[in-house]
Amino acid sequence: MDGVNDAANHTVESVPGRPSTASAPLEAGRRSPTGSRLYPRVTSFRSRRGALTPNQQGAWDRMWPRIGREVGDEPLDADAWFGRQAPLVIEIGCGTGTATAAMAAAEPHVNLIGIEVYQPGLAQLVQRIERDGIDNIRLLRGDAVDVLEHMIAAESLTGVRVFFPDPWPKARHHKRRLLQPATVALIAGRLRPGGVLHVATDHAGYAEHIAAVGAAEPLLVGLNEATGGDDERARTLAPIGLDRPVTKFEDKAHRAGSAITEFVWGKIE
């Protein structure tokens, strides 16, 4: 793959998990020979622990060796992993996989990789994949920024989905938000021309932040209404489906009176 950091033209502090140059003069993303980090990482996700149920563990043991991997530094050969050439989509923070499974089942011609750090959530998705016989999902456990930097080649993705990322509402935590300028630039560099970045949030403050960051990225153009385009035109131009199932989380947000803001940007061709 190409040189692994499309964020090189941005300050490293704007990428979640990357310290400022003042606190860490080492090259962003540099690791020790053993693969461990040479500095503490500020991540965009919260640490959570949880044990798998016996049924989840059984499904995990049967399925994970084939459909799952830990995030690493080696470039990913998605065609070999899926056993076919097909449009490649990644979903960052797939959680328990309700939307992941539904959208993959609706698009059997698409190869979909879900990325998540929380094993019990992944285990629920693994169970669903096994139960429903879904064959076009693969899973990566770990940090999505590492995936984008080290495992995904430039201009290889047809789509990137980020549904309801943690808004980190407190001002002092805004640096932890996933969708920062450098991260969006990294995503844009991994999208093929015509590929789409599809984002949804129920947090008004984060929506304003996301809108500004997306509008400032020169490789992206707004397709739907929230990004200055037209919803119907977005559906026509997008190379992947934009319809999401309403998850329990989203339904709870609706009942709490939170508005859902959806963004669709396309990579310039």
Curated annotation (Swiss-Prot):
Annotated S-adenosyl-L-methionine binding sites: 91, 116, 143, 166
Chemical reaction(s) catalysed: guanosine(46) in tRNA + S-adenosyl-L-methionine = N(7)-methylguanosine(46) in tRNA + S-adenosyl-L-homocysteine
Binding sites annotated in the UniProt record for substrate: 170, 202, 247-250
Highest taxon above the source species: Bacteria
A Pfam family recorded for this sequence: Methyltransf_4
Matching NCBIfam families: tRNA (guanosine(46)-N7)-methyltransferase TrmB
Protein name: tRNA (guanine-N(7)-)-methyltransferase
Species whose genome carries this gene: Nocardia farcinica (strain IFM 10152)
Gene designation per UniProt: trmB
